[in-house]
Each structure stands twice: as structure tokens, then as C-alpha cells.
Regions:
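A composition/biophysics-driven feature that prefers long, compositionally simple stretches
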Residues: 1-90
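Short, acidic (Asp/Glu-rich) active-site segment that either coordinates a divalent metal cofactor
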Residues: 2, 59-62, 69, 73, ...
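Residues in well-ordered beta-strands of folded domains
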Residues: 36, 112, 198
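Flexible loop/turn segments at secondary-structure boundaries
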Residues: 44, 133, 186-188
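General structural signal for alpha-helix termini and helix-helix connectors
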Residues: 67, 93-97, 199
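Active-site cores enriched in adjacent His and Asp/Glu residues with nearby glycine-rich loops
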Residues: 87-176
Length: 199
């Protein structure tokens, strides 16, 4: 998302937005008359950018940014493919870390360990206010019916009411189905894979 070491005519590095006006002046560009900001940006970011460009008209740039992000370069597609291949390799090993008597959290920890050992970066970004999850979600039994207040396809009560999603310490019993929805981030581009296993 923020690569370093890029070179090119229009590549300039800054440490904070307040440096942008001086940079634009230095390279001979005018300050913007209109500034598009994503509407789900924090109030602090909105206020800060507005102060950097006090004469600019602020407009909603959410739709434009979503459209820009939806189109991937060949380089980005390559990174997504690389991440997906590694993600799939880990999923082929999930059965090897399961043993009788495990809880959902114990299985999730083993899957997280596999992911990290295979190069998963361990950091995931979720779009949306106050939505958090660690590396994914493993749910089984009655917990699979528990709704979450988050805008996720899967629910689960979670281990704490402060993060109400995911595994809750349920014992995985014979005859149960286990839904595994773990994130892959091996290249800076996220993949998501969901599988259902029968015990």
C-alpha cells in the first residue's frame, strides 16, 4: 500500500500532508481548487487536509476511489495470485494440525501458526468503522448461529464482548461442521478463503 523505493518522474515521498503544498510549488503545480476526500475518512483526517488546503472546495471522493481501487495492474494481480497460491497451500495442511479434543480457538491458533510460518504478514485491513478481527474466523456448533454486529458474512460470539465475532472456545466434537474463514496477506494484497470441514 505504501511501497518505498519506487522511482519515476511523478514519485515524491512525504512524511505528512502539510508537506504537499510546498512540494506542489517546488515542482511547478498549482494548489488544488477542489479536493476529493473519501467520506469515511476520520473527522481528524478531514480537518487536517482541509487546513492544508484552506481555499480548496471539499468534495466526496469515495466513489472515484472505490473505482480506482477496483482496477488492478498486472503487477497487483501477480501479487494477489502469489498470495492466493500460498493461502491455498496452507489450507491443504489444516487437517494435519487438527486433533480430537481441540477447541475452536486451539484450531484457529494452529491455522494462524501455519499461515505465519508460510509467510503471512499477519496484518489485515478491514473497511468499515469499528470492525476488527485478528487473522480470521473459526466457528463450529451453536456458535455458528450467533450473529455479529459487524458487517461480516460469518458471525460467532467471539472470546470477549469487546470483539464480538469468531470462535468462543467451543469444543469441536465428532459430527460437527467447522467453518474456517482465514485471511491471507503474503504480499501486501489480501486474499480470503472460506472452507467448511466435517469432523
Amino acid at each position: 500500500r505504501r511501497p518505498i523505493g519506487l522511482k519515476g518522474e511523478n514519485v515524491h515521498y512525504i512524511h505528512k500532508p502539510e508537506q504537499i503544498p510546498a512540494l506542489l510549488t517546488e515542482i511547478g503545480l498549482p494548489l488544488p481548487r477542489k479536493l476529493a476526500i473519501e467520506w469515511d475518512a476520520s473527522h481528524g483526517d478531514f480537518t487536517r487536509l482541509s487546513a492544508v488546503f484552506p481555499d480548496a472546495e471539499i468534495t466526496n471522493g469515495s466513489a472515484v476511489m472505490r473505482k480506482v481501487r477496483s482496477v488492478k495492474t498486472d503487477y497487483e494481480l501477480g501479487l494477489l495470485h502469489e498470495s492466493a497460491v500460498k493461502h491455498a497451500e496452507v489450507y491443504h495442511r489444516i487437517e494435519s494440525v487438527y486433533h480430537n479434543g481441540m477447541t475452536d480457538i486451539e484450531l484457529q491458533i494452529e491455522i494462524e501458526r501455519l499461515l505465519r510460518l508460510h509467510g503471512n504478514l499477519g496484518l489485515f485491513r478491514i473497511n468499515g468503522q469499528s470492525m476488527e478481527i485478528f487473522m480470521g474466523n473459526v466457528i463450529c456448533g451453536d456458535n455458528a448461529d450467533t450473529p455479529t454486529p459487524y458487517d461480516f458474512a460469518m458471525g460467532g460470539a467471539g472470546l470477549s464482548c469487546s470483539i464480538p465475532v469468531g470462535c468462543n472456545g467451543s469444543l469441536i466434537r465428532p459430527g460437527m461442521t467447522v467453518m474456517i474463514d482465514m485471511c491471507g496477506n503474503f504480499t501486501g494484497y489480501m486474499t480470503d478463503m472460506t472452507r467448511v470441514y466435517s469432523v
